[in-house]
């Protein structure tokens, strides 16, 4: 509904900012990273915006960059991740760091974030890896993390191990999942591997 708000920064705290636009003060929840990037109080600035609509409330979320807003919205697509947890991820890590953790299949990098456990980290990686890769410009540092297909099988095995499956079982299931379509995406391979194990 809203792309961004431009106005005078009235106040800025670690978790929220107030922006005055045409005489109306809007309260935004922000990540720690956005709070650090905002200018001095009284200065005109822009906050890229996401509006969360619930039955009992409307809440604005503000972001210093379009990239952070985009990642926030992607995180909301992950099963079990709501606005509060998505904002916690962005407060705990910079956008490029989250991208790299997802593409490198490194859930341990997400564990230190408040509210992100082993299974949540695994779901974030499983459900967002292909989406993040599509957004990365060809030749960028982010894209290069996932460019090596040699580590693709190991990424899938590690993701299943993160979900609690033993390595031999995960390795065999990934092998079966790759047989019909060796170039399938990581998300597809893991879903097929999970289906294989559940059907046994």
From Swiss-Prot:
CDD domains: UBA_RuvA_C. GO terms for biological process: DNA recombination; DNA repair. The keyword DNA damage applies. Residues 1-64 are annotated as: Domain I. InterPro entries: DNA_helicase_Holl-junc_RuvA_I, NA-bd_OB-fold, RuvA, RuvA_2-like, RuvA_C, RuvA_C_sf. Signal peptide: none annotated. It is found in: Cytoplasm. One of its GO terms (molecular function) is four-way junction helicase activity. Residues 144-154 are annotated as: Flexible linker. The keyword DNA-binding applies. Residues 154-200 are annotated as: Domain III. It comes from the Bacteria. The RuvA-RuvB-RuvC complex processes Holliday junction (HJ) DNA during genetic recombination and DNA repair, while the RuvA-RuvB complex plays an important role in the rescue of blocked DNA replication forks via replication fork reversal (RFR). RuvA specifically binds to HJ cruciform DNA, conferring on it an open structure. The RuvB hexamer acts as an ATP-dependent pump, pulling dsDNA into and through the RuvAB complex. HJ branch migration allows RuvC to scan DNA until it finds its consensus sequence, where it cleaves and resolves the cruciform DNA. Belongs to the RuvA family. HAMAP family: DNA_HJ_migration_RuvA (MF_00031). Homotetramer. Forms an RuvA(8)-RuvB(12)-Holliday junction (HJ) complex. HJ DNA is sandwiched between 2 RuvA tetramers; dsDNA enters through RuvA and exits via RuvB. An RuvB hexamer assembles on each DNA strand where it exits the tetramer. Each RuvB hexamer is contacted by two RuvA subunits (via domain III) on 2 adjacent RuvB subunits; this complex drives branch migration. In the full resolvosome a probable DNA-RuvA(4)-RuvB(12)-RuvC(2) complex forms which resolves the HJ. This is Holliday junction branch migration complex subunit RuvA.
